Amino acid sequence: SLLVDGRSLGDIRQGVTLEVFGEGWSMGPLTDSMRAQLISMQGDLTFDVPWTSLGEYLDHVVSRGVATNVASFVGATTVRIHEVGFVNRPATPEELARMQDLVRQAMAEGALGVGSSLIYAPANYASTEELVALARAAGESGGMYISHMRDEGRGLLTATRELITIASQAGVPAEIYHLKAS
């Protein structure tokens, strides 16, 4: 973890100069309970969590010293947990509006866009419409949408169409990461 050892020697020795985070989950924005959970989940490597926003996290990493360049997407899962929690239900219009505001804040703090990891719960509880709304909020500041899609097997084409729908309806570029098609 860069929070424990910012030298990132394993990456630097392999020529990695940029580390990008936020593929579905990001280190902000955090509620108090999300922050407490992040602290309680630490294993042998422990670190302080003095931040609540994505921008504060990035500032914290840089202030501690880091060898690589760092950047982050804001996690669609993170903003969903922030407002909806871990329950399997659609976001209410009010929750969705707050989620969009969290994306806008993260974009103002330097996020590259929105990242989703739809193969895992609670990310897979998000509807296509929810993801369009979040991607659209990121697009207001030039952000993009990246996704580990809902399905990599028999539903691959449907999942790919969903990503294309999200990007086209939001008016943003998109990227599939962890594409595993055979």
Residue ranges: model-predicted function:
Residues 1-2, 148:
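Histidine-centered divalent metal-coordination motifs
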Residues 3-113:
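Divalent-metal coordination cores built from histidine and acidic residues
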